[in-house]
């Protein structure tokens, strides 16, 4: 196959060499539109047809338009002798997005990427090729800027991200249109492209024309910002940049270093760790900003941020990011704890350092886990009402303290704080927890 314009071929060759990519089989995300058609034909030529076109039918648009697009895709691949796989979405994206509380765009993207990953494995391919171009990159940077992204966001769409490649990121939309026109190649026009249904369309159709009128050549400036942002991001990727102690279920930071470091670097470090652990978390800047209001000299330990997957805590002179996977290793407990003696739990070794009760001779307490809470109440409803006060605490960390079978205190083993006490009986208590999730 020979094209009248080989400019895109040159850029794809440069892209492959720059990123040291092999020429093994590629799954090409194909919609029949201008960008993916250009990518498909150029990769067919560059990789000697070692490609598979993959079409994902979302069925967000009317069925008749979706079916016409499918027919176009089939006819196109037959014409150019390209292997094609079609996958139809098995959920109703519109109704499911409402149920999940996410945007149609976000859910559609997730379904599409999952299908592409499955196609990659099923066909023993090396890469998934997406047709994002230079203009898509500019739109993305603008959207992320107005959404308050960090440098990682302003770096733009990565050209290579694990097994996903984007060979057209250095190719502009006019270059794509010129390629299609010169070679008389027909494409399918998505009717929603001209409608302002989605954020990208609004940016493309409404915002960019206004920016172009005021800031001529703004694209070059945004490309420069993107390049500088990438350099900073790559520099901050160095492991030694911020000292971190890593355990089985936690990451621990020095409190002073944590607070002295620029907020941006702390935020991206937290997100980087969460991503490495496979945790997708939506945390607001406001919530993260609260972390920096900690008083260094204050001795009190406390939970700073809590989600379903992890929590951030201040403990002594450390900030700890702890994952809730420890619940798999947790075992209920019921034992007698004496002053000055250690006792082993699944959460670590515990020491009762100090105990003062109204009875001077008391030097031991009965300690048990949350599972045994009902033994101290004759009425279950009263028990439920009483323990509803501690709904914000993780139950696996609550240690109940009893004297003569009477509940006199509750300690949160995560923070080592006394969260409740019968003040007429329990005057003072101090414990240590070593090992388990965290090392002291």
From Swiss-Prot:
MF annotations from Gene Ontology: ATP binding; tRNA(Ile)-lysidine synthase activity
GO biological process: tRNA modification
Primary location: cytoplasm
Localization terms from the record: Cytoplasm
Cellular component GO terms held in the UniProt record: cytoplasm
Alphabetically ordered keywords of this record: ATP-binding, Cytoplasm, Ligase, Nucleotide-binding, tRNA processing
Segments passing through the bilayer: none
InterPro entries, A to Z: Rossmann-like_a/b/a_fold, TilS/TtcA_N, tRNA_Ile_lys_synt, tRNA_Ile_lys_synt_N
Substrates-to-products reaction catalysed: cytidine(34) in tRNA(Ile2) + L-lysine + ATP = lysidine(34) in tRNA(Ile2) + AMP + diphosphate + H(+)
SUPFAM superfamilies per UniProt: Adenine nucleotide alpha hydrolases-like (SSF52402)
Record EC number: 6.3.4.19
Coiled-coil blocks: none
Residues noted as binding ATP in the record, renumbered to the chain: 31-36
Recorded family membership: Belongs to the tRNA(Ile)-lysidine synthase family.
Domain notes: The N-terminal region contains the highly conserved SGGXDS motif, predicted to be a P-loop motif involved in ATP binding.
Summary of the function given for this chain in its UniProt record: Ligates lysine onto the cytidine present at position 34 of the AUA codon-specific tRNA(Ile) that contains the anticodon CAU, in an ATP-dependent manner. Cytidine is converted to lysidine, thus changing the amino acid specificity of the tRNA from methionine to isoleucine.
Protein name: tRNA(Ile)-lysidine synthase
Protein's organism: Borreliella afzelii (strain PKo) (Borrelia afzelii)
